[in-house]
């Protein structure tokens, strides 16, 4: 199967958003929520063309009458039937392509269960009949997108965060750390602290409103304690947000208390280290000779790193942990929300990558376990 004549598809299946498009493009064509919604009520009007399930933006727009489910939790697919619906929607409705005509590059979180990528491989070849496919590690793709071959990627999405040190293009698996604390946990935490303010958000549809509040208004404080005092003594930090029904709510210290949980997971009742400490621990698991190169190339990627102020705070926290003479550089590319996808687009269009694809023939010969031999 010759990869030259046909464009590969790149699908970055995040826990929160699915990013899809064509290899060689500089941005994904389709970006939609990884949601499958099912009606909460039975339809009474005949001929309305009501469906038993909705995917992506359509589910989002009809969320008032639907129960929304995310098939990917913490980067791991928990519902394969819904996942198939999302892929089907990606190929046929969003990209409008026939999957049997294009090689497909999929992404996954590091340290995922092996069964997860085997099942992905199986569905691609058996349900969608793709001619070839590949599963790439998300953080590695982000590094590609930043134009580096060495660095430590702190990738934080909706479902999972991880730090992946990469040296001269090789990921160092023993030093990869995973943190099951990401955007969705911050949204839940925001729901909780808004409840303390007297605003109640409980349903799956209301959670989406809170996610929007978080994305539009939250930021990371450089000094949390000082910021708390500022918020207590003046209303300078207060912002208002208009709910879909016209009601206006005011939010103050919640704006920075919410993402602070990334640095202090104890806010969520978690015992784990914050993202700064996880990054540091990951660097310390690497050989002493390469640490300097990692400290100098800390690459942020994923939607949860989009909070204003996160890079400065990360710099401050890492500087406090690292040796005093160490030069620390945090790279936060403006397009980091999509850097995994962009890296996939770059990788799948490299001529040297074309022999890396798992072909249908290889799959038929070896079965799903081929994915562990061919993919990283």
Swiss-Prot record:
Any one biological process term the GO annotation gives: cell morphogenesis
PROSITE patterns tied to this protein: ACTINS_1, ACTINS_2, ACTINS_ACT_LIKE
Key word Phosphoprotein present: yes
Keywords: ATP-binding, Cytoplasm, Cytoskeleton, Hydrolase, Nucleotide-binding, Phosphoprotein
Catalytic activity as recorded in UniProt: ATP + H2O = ADP + phosphate + H(+)
Protein's cellular compartments: Cytoplasm, Cytoskeleton
Cellular component terms per the entry's GO annotation: actin cytoskeleton; actin filament; cell cortex; cell leading edge; cell pole; cell-cell junction; cortical actin cytoskeleton; early phagosome
Cited InterPro entries: Actin, Actin/actin-like_CS, Actin_CS, ATPase_NBD
GO molecular function, one term: structural constituent of cytoskeleton
Pfam families: Actin (PF00022)
Modified residues (Phosphotyrosine): 54
Signal peptide: none
Disulfide-bond pairs as recorded: none
Protein family (similarity comment): Belongs to the actin family.
Function: Actins are highly conserved proteins that are involved in various types of cell motility and are ubiquitously expressed in all eukaryotic cells. Multiple isoforms are involved in various cellular functions such as cytoskeleton structure, cell mobility, chromosome movement and muscle contraction.
Protein name according to UniProt: Major actin
Species this chain originates from: Dictyostelium discoideum (Social amoeba)
């Amino acid at each position: 199967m010759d990869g030259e004549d046909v464009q590969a598809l790149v699908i970055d299946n995040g826990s929160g958003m699915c990013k899809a498009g064509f290899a060689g493009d500089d941005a994904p064509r389709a970006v939609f929520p990884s949601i499958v919604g099912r009606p909460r009520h039975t339809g009474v009007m005949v001929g309305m063309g009501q469906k038993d399930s909705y995917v992506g933006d359509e589910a989002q727009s009809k969320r008032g009458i639907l129960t929304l489910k995310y098939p990917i939790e913490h980067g791991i697919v928990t519902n394969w039937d819904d996942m198939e619906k999302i892929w089907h929607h990606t190929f046929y409705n969003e990209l409008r392509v026939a999957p049997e005509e294009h090689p497909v590059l999929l992404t996954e979180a590091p340290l995922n269960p092996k069964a997860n990528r085997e099942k992905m491989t199986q569905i691609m070849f058996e349900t969608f009949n793709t001619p070839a496919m590949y599963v790439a590690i998300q953080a590695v793709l982000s590094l590609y997108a930043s134009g580096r071959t060495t660095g430590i990627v702190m990738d934080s999405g909706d479902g999972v965060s991880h730090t992946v040190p990469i040296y001269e293009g090789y990921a160092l698996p023993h030093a990869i750390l995973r943190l099951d604390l990401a955007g969705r946990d911050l949204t839940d935490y925001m729901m909780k602290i808004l409840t303390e303010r007297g605003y109640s958000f409980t349903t799956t549809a209301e959670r989406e409103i809170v996610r929007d509040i978080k994305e539009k208004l939250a930021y990371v404080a450089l000094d949390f304690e000082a910021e708390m005092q500022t918020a207590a003594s003046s209303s300078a930090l207060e912002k208002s947000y208009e709910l879909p029904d016209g009601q206006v709510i005011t939010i103050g210290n919640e704006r920075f208390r919410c993402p602070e949980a990334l640095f202090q997971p104890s806010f969520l009742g978690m015992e784990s280290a914050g993202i700064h400490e996880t990054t540091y621990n990951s660097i310390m698991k690497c050989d002493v000779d390469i640490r300097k190169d990692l400290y100098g190339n800390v690459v942020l990627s994923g939607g949860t790193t989009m909070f204003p102020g996160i890079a400065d705070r990360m710099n401050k926290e890492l500087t406090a942990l690292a040796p005093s003479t160490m030069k620390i550089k945090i790279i936060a590319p403006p397009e980091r929300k999509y850097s995994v996808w962009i890296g996939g687009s770059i990788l799948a269009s490299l001529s040297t990558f074309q022999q890396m694809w798992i072909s249908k023939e290889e799959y038929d010969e070896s079965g799903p376990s081929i994915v562990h031999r061919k993919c990283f």
